[in-house]
Amino acid sequence: MATYAIGDLQGCHRHFLELLDLIGFNATRDRLWLVGDIVNRGPDSLSLLRTLIELGDAVTMVLGNHDLHLLAVAAGSIRQQHGDTLQPVLEASDSSRLLDWLRHQQLFHHEDEYVLVHAGLLPNWSIEQAQILAQEVETIIRGDRFQTFSRSMYGNVPDHWHDRLQGEDRWRVIINAMTRMRVCSPEGRMNFSCKGELSSVPDGLLPWFEIPWRASKDTTIVFGHWSALGLHLTPNLIALDTGCVWQGCLTSVRLEDRKVFQVPCVRH
């Protein structure tokens, strides 16, 4: 049995199948950990969703910002944006089944010495607190309040956490941290303007995982979202978004020995 963590797929179904072939994946024996952003921008989100559902318990995934965007569009809360490739999912005969499956995925997964999350964790969150906060928002996503909340889900404020936050502000901070964050101030305030390489992070900001006092630093965080960061491996960090949808590559790391597997994502 092996566990393969895989970076942002974004509708790249063919490359996903190529990666499974490369690693010799066996659904009766092995497990896949997916960092989220399963859908959108790529050519075949519909087939990818269907394949993941067919794989059943072999798949553990967390929601990314594009996955939440699909759910918000499907709820009628927001319109599609330029570059979205979600229409085939929305028009599919089994659309309700696909969306219901997606809606019931996690924001945060903690197992043994690993955490799986799409973007990151705020520095003042312990693993235990992050788990509780994620479950709080998962309840919203799966319930009747999501349609209303999703209209304002992605505002940039508040930009930091404090325990007094309530309602939509509270849920927005949790979602922003777990699905959108890349950098913070040294005090833990999120900044969403920086999307480039590590070398381009401006003075006064740090990658969220380099905040010295980060409460989760002793746990290995597996994440994606930051394609300009690319494959980034440190003792307690596995970053996996290598820009498949931008014709980079699709990356998997086998957690047991950190062996790296990659397939090029050139479009034909």
From Swiss-Prot:
Q: If you read the UniProt record, what top EC class would you report for this enzyme, in one word?
A: hydrolase
Domain of life of the organism encoding this protein: Bacteria
- Keywords, ordered alphabetically: Hydrolase
A GO molecular function term, named singly, is: bis(5'-nucleosyl)-tetraphosphatase (symmetrical) activity
Entry annotated with the keyword Hydrolase:
yes
Listed Pfam families: Metallophos
Q: What is its EC number?
A: 3.6.1.41
Q: Which reaction does it catalyse?
A: P(1),P(4)-bis(5'-adenosyl) tetraphosphate + H2O = 2 ADP + 2 H(+)
Q: Which residues form the signal peptide?
A: none
Query: Sorted alphabetically, which PANTHER family does this protein's record hold?
Result: CYTOCHROME C5, PTHR40942
Instruction: State the NCBIfam families in the record.
Output: apaH, PRK00166.1
Q: What does this protein do?
A: Hydrolyzes diadenosine 5',5'''-P1,P4-tetraphosphate to yield ADP.
Q: What family does this chain come from, according to its entry?
A: Belongs to the Ap4A hydrolase family.
Protein known as: Bis(5'-nucleosyl)-tetraphosphatase, symmetrical
